[in-house]
Structures are given as C-alpha cells and as structure tokens.
C-alpha cells in the first residue's frame, strides 16, 4: 500500500474484516481522486469510508432500501443492483466518464452478480479500473438461496488418496508411462534431426492427452460459479490465441489483466489499453 492508512473499524463497516486485501489491491489510490460506485450499502457506513479514502471524486451507492441521509459527499440511490436503468442514471449523474472503482456487496447471488458485472464492466468501469465482488464464498453455504453444500475433496491437488497406500497403475496409466518413456525428449539426442525432436515432444504430450486426467470438476454453484467464469475470462488472450482456437472477436475490448481471489473477495483489474490481455 502506497497511500494513507485508514482504520475501517472507526466507520462501523464490515470492510474491517478484510481491509488488508483492500489495501493491497487498491491502497495506492487512497488519498487521490477516484469515482466510486458500491452496490449494497445498507446503513451507508462504507460510503463514509470511501469519502475519506479519496479526497475527490463521486461516491455513490445503490441499495434496495432507501438511504435518506448519505454521509459526506456521497449520494445514494434506491434500486436493484442488476437494473441497467438505475445503473445508467447513477453513472450519468455522477461519473459520465466511468467509475474507477466498483464494489458489489449487494445480493451475493450468482445471477444478479453476473448481470451487474457484465453490464458495469462494459459500460461504466473505466479502463484501468477495478471491480470487486465481496463475500462470494457464501455459495458454499447450503442455507444460502443459491448456495450448495460442497461435496468435493479439500486436500491439496498434489496429495495422494487418504489411504496412503500405493496403488498399482491401471491399464491407462501403464500405457501412458510406456509411451512417455519411449517419447521422452531427453532420450532423443540433441543432434537428432529437428523433425525427430519435434515428433518426440509431440508424442510425449500426446501420451498425457490420451490417457491422463484432463478434467478437474469443481463447485460451480452461485457466486462460486461466477468466480470460476472470471478465471476463464482472465485467460481470454490464451483462449482466443492461435493455440486456443476460439474466435478472436470474442476478446473484450478492455479485457481482464489480473484477477485476485481471496476467501472473501475477488478483485478484477481492467486493462488500460484496448486489447491488452492478461499476463499468462
């Protein structure tokens, strides 16, 4: 963090629970100018915090419930987070050139979170801006409207089955090992013909493609599913590249340059330059 320090506990907002993540990702903006939009503001405590974090710029909030007396220079609007009409109005009246920072702390429901992101990212978030989704992990709560009990394995991906006993390789694994052993590039002399070296590398990789594990299903309920879609969007430059095979016109004009996922939040950073993809 390069900017001034703020203590969110003084404002009564739950942002205090993960303020260090905010400081790491957007702290360099504190003390300067920023146009801010927050979806879901309840009593408006976070609007007071943003008003102090940024010395100038619009501070706006949208909530289903009215906020008759917003703090400081903040302005509050009543409406649904996914309603383009209210979102357009807020932007038109406060940040016609776009917002530098948008925080979604509203419904925490996948359908509405996705709708808000899709519209605001393309229409009202400035190039170089940051979009934040708070409390996405409620998708793992069975009691949440679109949540669901997690049924997967919580052990690290590299850890073998819990039994700890070495399992004999099956037919597919046996074939894979033998093909890789023959095609291992290190077994092909560096002085061999380039085409032979290329064939060895291709065979080595093909052995995994044909017999190895290629899919790793995960929890895709609610906002957790949205976060995983965002991971796909972060790799848009690879998806639309020559090896990805997806039409290049599918790449957003201002794609994602970086996505940071924490247990509570997702920070999505937007490219400053059109066509600038993620660093993959």
Residue ranges and their predicted role:
Residues 1-103, 107-132, 137-280:
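A short alpha-helical cap/connector motif
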């Amino acid at each position: 963090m390069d900017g001034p320090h703020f203590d969110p506990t003084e404002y009564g907002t739950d942002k205090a629970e993960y303020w260090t993540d905010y400081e790491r990702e957007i702290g360099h903006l504190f003390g300067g100018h920023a146009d801010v939009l927050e979806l879901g503001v309840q009593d408006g405590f976070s609007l007071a915090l943003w008003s102090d974090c940024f010395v100038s710029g619009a501070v706006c909030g949208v909530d289903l419930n009215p906020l008759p007396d917003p703090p400081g220079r903040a302005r509050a609007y009543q409406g649904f987070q996914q309603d383009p009409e209210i979102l357009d109005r807020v932007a038109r009246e406060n940040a016609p050139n776009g917002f530098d920072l948008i925080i979604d702390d509203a419904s925490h429901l996948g359908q509405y979170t996705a709708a808000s992101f899709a519209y605001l990212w393309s229409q009202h978030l400035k190039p170089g801006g940051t979009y934040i989704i708070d409390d996405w992990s409620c998708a793992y709560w069975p009691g949440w409207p679109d949540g669901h009990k997690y049924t997967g394995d919580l052990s690290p991906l590299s850890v073998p089955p819990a039994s700890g006993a070495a399992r004999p390789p099956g037919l597919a694994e046996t074939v894979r090992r033998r093909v890789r052993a023959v095609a291992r590039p290190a077994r092909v002399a560096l002085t061999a013909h380039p085409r032979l070296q290329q064939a060895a590398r291709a065979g080595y990789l093909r052995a995994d493609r044909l017999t190895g594990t290629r899919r790793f299903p995960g929890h895709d309920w609610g906002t957790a599913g949205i976060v995983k879609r965002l991971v796909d969007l972060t790799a848009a430059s690879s998806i639309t590249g020559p090896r990805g095979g997806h039409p290049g016109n599918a790449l957003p004009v201002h794609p994602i340059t970086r996505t940071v996922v924490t247990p509570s939040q997702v920070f999505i950073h937007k490219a400053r330059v059109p066509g600038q993809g993620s660093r993959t």
